[in-house]
Amino acid sequence: MARDATKLEATVAKLKKHWAESAPRDMRAAFSTDPGRFGRYSLCLDDLLFDWSKCRVNDETMALLKELAVAADVEGRRAAMFAGEHINNTEDRAVLHVALRDTSSKEVLVDGHNVLPDVKHVLDRMAAFADGIRSGALKGATGRKITDIVNIGIGGSDLGPVMATLALAPYHDEPRAHFVSNIDGAHIADTLSPLDPASTLIIVASKTFTTIETMTNAQTARKWVADTLGEAAVGAHFAAVSTALDKVAAFGIPEDRVFGFWDWVGGRYSVWSAIGLPVMIAVGPDNFRKFLAGAHAMDVHFRDAPLEKNLPVMLGLIGYWHRAICGYGSRAIIPYDQRLSRLPAYLQQLDMESNGKSVTLDGKPVSGPTGPVVWGEPGTNGQHAFFQLLHQGTDTIPLEFIVAAKGHEPTLDHQHEMLMANCLAQSEALMKGRTLDEARAQLQAKNLPASQVERIAPHRVFSGNRPSLTLIHDMLDPYALGRLIALYEHRVFVEAQIFGINAFDQWGVELGKELATELLPVVSGKEGASGRDASTQGLVAHLHARRKA
């Protein structure tokens, strides 16, 4: 069926009425009166558990949310994506990051062309190159083994590889991986400073080989290599992820060190492609293929499971409920796993660049809020930074906890148990809170004077009823990481379909690039600032004055 705008609007109205009148208000009571609540509001895919029972939903909520997904034609849009249709309508492109990890199908067609042989060819070339670097068969210009790789990219060419490489640290042997993204010269200076050009490989990740931040840093790195080893050494110390073969050749990188990808792969969905080359070098081709396999398992589940048993669909529906119906403008991603410390930033781009839109697929203003602000830090660090606001602040911010049942350090299992206890305790505390009577009783148990009890007790009250969901997997390994990232990719897709927006363009990013290009000659003093707004003129003048001081 097609998207039914009338039915969708009516279901949204029913959801808003339900939220105002009959959604759970007291989560303690919801659990105490309903022993089956956890069982009904949780799902598993193998070892991966998704629990949303602490969110303020009941059976009526879930029935209406399923009705919403049907009216929005989530299933039809999903089928169109997997079929290679051009669902990115503003750029007239297919959206097929799922093909990058598909090892089971015989064909996936884009405009009549089977892309799977192309994907396999690039993946096999990546594996051969990664094995060559890791084994020492591919050496630097002086004959030394490569000990360090530096990936230069930005946005999707950086956030995914950084996140995945850090997450899979237990699977590293060598070489060491470093990442440069910011145009700020301090970033590349600090990265290159302790390294030796003779044992360093630099990967330049830019599809067009024109991204200003990436190419500026690449030229700096090229000079660093050439000044020490000579111009002839450049080719042995660089590789590129790009489709602009002429520009790559002009830079000095041989064609056999260039790895391409396709316009049906968006930047923030590209870690599965050649953009993942630094990840593959760091953890090895076998582990990278397990990473792809985990994502593919989630793809198959998302494609085939019925709506009410589908993890990405249910995660997306809860996300929509929190954003559009409950009115929560933010969501916090809290992985209780230090190696997932860059996951919140990765999901921030995935979600906010995808669903930070204000017009519908047909170019009309949206009728309600779209993507939330996404942010977070790993636990337990976040508990000592911003959890105060999450517990007692005036805004309700849903949390998404992620934790593994087992850590990678068997001799430190007691610390992992403490980590898990903190995760579950925060989830419970946000839901249950603490009443004024409980706060009084706690203080009275310390034999404090009655006047002090009455003065302090209100400060120790927690409203509770603050929603959170929890994802638990066995262990953070390549397969589990791939599955987790694919879960969030498809969740973004589901929310976008209900919002009625295009999750696969990013025109807001392009605007900033255009203005930065225009302002560079002004900031460098080659052009005047006249014609700019008064604020920009004043800022430029101040910068010029301080640079001369």
Curated annotation (Swiss-Prot):
What family name appears in the similarity comment? Belongs to the GPI family.
CDD domains, from UniProt? SIS_PGI_1, SIS_PGI_2
InterPro entries, A to Z: G6P_Isomerase, G6P_Isomerase_C, Phosphoglucose_isomerase_CS, SIS_dom_sf, SIS_PGI_1, SIS_PGI_2
The entry's protein name is: Glucose-6-phosphate isomerase
> What is the purpose of this protein?
Catalyzes the reversible isomerization of glucose-6-phosphate to fructose-6-phosphate.
Q: Gene for this protein?
A: pgi
Q: Which PROSITE patterns match?
A: P_GLUCOSE_ISOMERASE_1, P_GLUCOSE_ISOMERASE_2, P_GLUCOSE_ISOMERASE_3
From the UniProt record, list the reaction(s) this protein catalyses: alpha-D-glucose 6-phosphate = beta-D-fructose 6-phosphate
> Where, per UniProt, does this protein localize?
Cytoplasm
| S-S bonds | none
Q: Which residues form the active site?
A: 353, 384, 513
Cite the entry's keywords alphabetically: Cytoplasm, Gluconeogenesis, Glycolysis, Isomerase
Question: What GO biological process terms does the UniProt entry carry, in alphabetical order?
Answer: gluconeogenesis; glucose 6-phosphate metabolic process; glycolytic process
What Gene Ontology cellular-component terms does the record carry? cytosol
Q: Name one Pfam family in it.
A: PGI
Q: Which domain of life is it from?
A: Bacteria
Q: What is its main location?
A: cytoplasm
Q: Which GO terms describe its molecular function?
A: carbohydrate derivative binding; glucose-6-phosphate isomerase activity; monosaccharide binding
> Looking at the keywords, is Cytoplasm present?
yes
Pathway(s) served: Carbohydrate biosynthesis; gluconeogenesis; Carbohydrate degradation; glycolysis; D-glyceraldehyde 3-phosphate and glycerone phosphate from D-glucose: step 2/4
EC number(s) given by UniProt:
5.3.1.9
